[in-house]
């Protein structure tokens, strides 16, 4: 039934494409076959319409395109569009997904590439539905179908087979499959699972990976292999190379608590929520609350501290899918006392660059890596501001995740909304894709009316769908952004 519905939904689009291609073919009155002449320049004159949504058709007029669509490339900014056909003087293309709010259209044929004057405005659409949870937390119900599930969702991940993995606050890890209407317990507290540890999927092996929380767990990492039914197994660091840095360790208690942390709160510098994979060198990387960035050899389980970032809690950490050595860090606002200007911020660091930068920083005399950059506004004040990332403000970042195109999605617990950073634009731009900043609630539907409440983790799957742990609403929400 689902396959039939999808096919029906695609049918009108196919008909539109066929009709429009027929129209542009009829527009060419030249009976001769149009062949691109590489010795002459391509000519760009105009395009229409000047705005549209994903998969809508755009006509590009000019000359010397040729009618061989296979040699023609069309770009909306840096995003390549699907070329439907060409008459030699007119090209028909489909608008690609999320190319940017304002786009420069360019045509590339062989060694020639030219851009149209004027801009194309991309019309983004976002909507949200609920895929799991009836809004009730207790008693926990995991085995009666997704619509009857009762839970309190925290952090969330997605594998390459469209399974969703959820950490419930009761320290239970769940596998969710929409197609099967299934919620399955994978790990429990008795096995050592902690709900704050985000499940990260290794893009090379599809194995789930996570770090560990709390003092005494510095060397521990957990793995879940789908080939073994996601049975949880542990790996431990066997040898440390401190590399001149201080090894993460329990350091007593916060002396000057801020952001509501009670006096005497444990300073758990041994906590490392994530286990990330870098495809460039095949190593694992993690970040400790102390700020240490650690490289781990998955064959020998030897760990090396490659450098420091400012200390503090970062629930959301992710590797960039295009700039694959970049670790992006979302600092939360209830971090340790010394986090200072890095609270509520988006930052990044290159894990393959171990050069030391600043010796003296606002967070003490740590040798911060030279590649570390705070990218959002130069203030620790929480808030909400869209626009260029260097001016943007956030409030309690609890989860970050990249889609395959390098768009960074951010779950803000404090603002009860979802933000997006186009990390491939210059400057990088931030926008609120769904939810009303500072207005909590529970409403499904389009961007203009949708509501979240105290959302925590989020993850983008391979197709760009966003799954959100809607913490206060006790539900899992799914966002389609196009």
Q: Where are these predicted regions, by residue range?
A:
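Beta-strand/beta-sandwich contexts
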Residues: 27-67, 71, 101, 112-129
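Short glycine/acidic-enriched loop and turn motifs that connect beta-strands
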Residues: 171-172, 214-218, 291, 333-338, ...
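Residue-level detector of Asp-centered blade-edge/turn motifs that repeat once per structural unit
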Residues: 158-161, 201-205, 277-281, 319-324, ...
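Blade-level signature of beta-propeller repeat domains, shared across WD40, Kelch, NHL, RCC1
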Residues: 446, 453-482
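Loop/turn-rich, solvent-exposed surfaces of beta-rich toroidal or solenoidal domains
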Residues: 393-422, 434
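Gly/Pro-rich loop segments of beta-rich domains
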Residues: 60, 124-154, 180-195, 214, ...
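Conserved beta-propeller blade signature
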Residues: 163-166, 206-211, 282-286, 326-330, ...
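C-terminal motif of bacterial Sec signal peptides marking the signal peptidase cleavage site
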Residues: 21-25
